[in-house]
């Protein structure tokens, strides 16, 4: 699985990212070593530019990063557009594991922004969003036509499958999950009666309350074999819907809940958040649900794990030392936190350390303020 965060793609044993010049780097999780993803002798690692339109470095990438560059089954894959041919077309690029012999393997039409990617079995599964409508001459005829959906590419024959689109203001895909030839994905959008002007006015008054009152959060499934899209549920007045192992976890003013995508039933979770605020996203590993709550009066963040409706406290940290879990990949827990120099950083701890309440992260990368 790949997880996009800032310009970073997180894997089980490494992290890939593109630097400001579009050069691919790999960070080895075990050692923390950051290296340019290139094994060509004497390469200067020059990226794309006006004076270097065809760089020889296999680590050079161009265009919107989209969902980043992913190592999978001994190949390097990239979903994006490095040709500037058409802003509504993206490609799946396939290359050798060292970045050489790059070729376009599949064409994705009517897709402007790739927002996430997942590699499972023999599929590339991605989420996208569009904002503008173009005519045949590629002129903008409507700059406010938001829509979003998912695509699936079969790596055996590079056939492209497309789900039905969701529309309306700020339509977006927030999570994707794959299991047994079915893709589950969560969506967010404003109701059909909410206009862009209403959103602007609501944001200027109280953006968080306006979103809570007017956002619709959905869970869909896409059956690849039948090429069928089904809306399983759409919920209003909730916060931060997350797909964890295919089920939808979220909170509202009434507490924490999980929507079971198989039974299509919702049940409340025994999480006591009275007088507390969720800190960071919910995450799962096996049967455990990990969550953190900040306490308004104590300036502390408490970390828990939940199993069989029983919560276990793992640790307490001051808000200055607190962290958010970005991803749990096997025994590696990737976290974001602020280091002693005030920089936002990506680091890693082991799952065993998390369960024992030990937070001594290995720093992998720090982000500039503009990132």
Indicate where each model-derived feature is located.
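Short, conserved, GDST-rich strand-edge loop motifs in beta-rich repeat architectures
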Residues: 81-86, 128-145, 188-214
């Amino acid at each position: 699985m790949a997880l996009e965060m800032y310009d970073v793609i997180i894997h089980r044993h490494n992290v890939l990212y593109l630097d400001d010049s579009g050069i691919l780097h790999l960070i080895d999780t075990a050692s923390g070593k950051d290296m340019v993803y290139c094994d060509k002798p004497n390469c200067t690692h020059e990226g794309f530019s006006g004076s270097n339109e065809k760089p020889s470095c296999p680590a050079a990438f161009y265009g919107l990063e989209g969902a980043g560059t992913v190592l999978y089954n001994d190949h390097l894959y990239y979903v994006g557009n490095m040709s500037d041919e058409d802003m509504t077309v993206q490609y799946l690029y396939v290359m050798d594991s060292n970045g050489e012999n790059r070729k376009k393997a599949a064409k994705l039409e009517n897709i402007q922004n790739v927002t996430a990617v997942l590699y499972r079995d023999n599929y590339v599964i991605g989420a996208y969003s569009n904002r503008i409508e173009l005519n045949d001459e590629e002129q903008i005829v409507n700059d406010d036509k938001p829509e979003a959906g998912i695509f699936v590419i079969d790596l055996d024959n590079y056939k492209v499958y497309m789900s039905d689109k969701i529309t309306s203001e700020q339509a977006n895909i927030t999570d994707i999950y794959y299991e047994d030839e079915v893709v589950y994905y969560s969506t967010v959008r404003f109701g059909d009666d909410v206009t862009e002007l209403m959103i602007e006015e609501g944001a200027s008054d109280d953006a968080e309350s306006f979103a809570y009152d007017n956002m619709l959060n959905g869970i869909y499934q896409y059956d690849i074999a039948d090429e069928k899209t089904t809306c399983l549920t759409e919920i209003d007045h909730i916060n931060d819907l997350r797909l964890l192992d295919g089920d939808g976890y979220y909170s509202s003013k009434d507490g924490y809940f999980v929507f079971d995508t198989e039974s299509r039933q919702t049940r409340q979770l025994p999480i006591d958040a009275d007088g507390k605020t969720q800190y960071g996203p919910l995450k799962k590993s096996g049967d455990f649900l990990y969550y953190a709550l900040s306490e308004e009066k104590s300036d502390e963040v408490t970390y828990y794990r939940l199993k069989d409706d029983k919560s276990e406290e793992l640790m307490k940290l001051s808000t200055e030392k607190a962290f958010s879990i970005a991803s749990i990949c096997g025994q590696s827990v990737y976290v974001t936190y602020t280091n002693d120099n005030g920089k936002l950083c990506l680091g890693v701890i082991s799952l065993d350390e998390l369960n024992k309440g030990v937070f001594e992260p290995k720093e992998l990368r720090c982000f500039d303020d503009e990132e």
